[in-house]
Amino acid sequence: MEQDYLTIDETINIINLNTVNLTQYIDSKTLLIFDNNILLESKFISLQEIFNLLDFILFDIIDFLVKSVLPKIPIVNYNYRITGNKAYERFVDLDTNKILSPTFDIEIVDSIDKIIDFSKIFQHS
C-alpha cells in the first residue's frame, strides 16, 4: 500500500497531489507538490481549506480559458462578448459557503432582431 504522506520530521509533511488520499486531515506545516514542483507552503487547518484553494485555482483557470478562447470562435453574423465574475470576486463574499461553478454570460452586442434570432437557434436544437 502506497503511503499518503511522508513525514520529514515532527512539523513538516509532504503531500504529493498525484497520490494523496484527500480524506486525510492535514493540520501541520505542509508542502504541496505536483509533478515535483512546490505549489504552496502553508499551514492548513482542514481539508476544506485545501479544497477551497484547489477550487479557487481551477475556477480561475476555467475563467481564463473561457474568456480568452470563446470570444475567438466566430458565430456567423453575430457580435458577442463573454462576461462573468472572477473567482476572487466570489471569495470576497464571506457569506458564500457553497460550491459554485464558473458562471459566464454570452452577451450579443447587436440589434434586438439579431438577439431574437440567436435565441431561436437554441430553441430548435
Curated annotation (Swiss-Prot):
<protein>
    <recommendedName>
        <fullName>Uncharacterized protein R391</fullName>
    </recommendedName>
</protein>
